[in-house]
């Protein structure tokens, strides 16, 4: 039973970059900046999930959507790992902090596509 409980201190470590929405002044204009999950993928039960996650993350960065995020993110995107209770593996999400206008463009162009 003890192994099934979530280790909240470890989860906090993975989510340390997450912040709420904020407003910034960029080129004399006030823009809203917030976090957005830009890519998700699953991984089976492997010995070192961080090591095995490097390839899918790198492959996504080479896509058109990945290049857009890397160019328009306000700071370096980060990944978050969670346990996947459905298949005893892991779920990874890549999160980026972007302007609201860039988030809208990304959602309209890339969400729901294979890119």
Language-model segments: residues:
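Short, compact, well-ordered microdomains
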Residues: 81-115
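Structured alpha/beta or helical-core interaction and ligand-binding surfaces enriched in interleaved
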Residues: 2-89
């Amino acid at each position: 039973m003890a192994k099934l409980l979530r280790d909240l201190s470890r989860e906090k470590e993975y989510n340390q970059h997450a912040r709420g929405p904020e407003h910034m002044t960029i080129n004399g204009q006030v823009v809203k900046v917030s976090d957005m999950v830009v890519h998700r993928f699953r991984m089976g039960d492997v010995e070192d999930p961080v090591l095995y996650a490097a390839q899918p993350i790198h492959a996504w960065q080479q896509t058109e959507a990945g290049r857009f995020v890397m160019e328009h993110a306000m700071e370096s995107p980060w990944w978050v790992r969670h346990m996947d209770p459905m298949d005893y593996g892991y779920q990874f999400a890549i999160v980026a902090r972007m302007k609201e206008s860039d988030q809208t463009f990304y959602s309209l162009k890339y969400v729901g596509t294979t890119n």
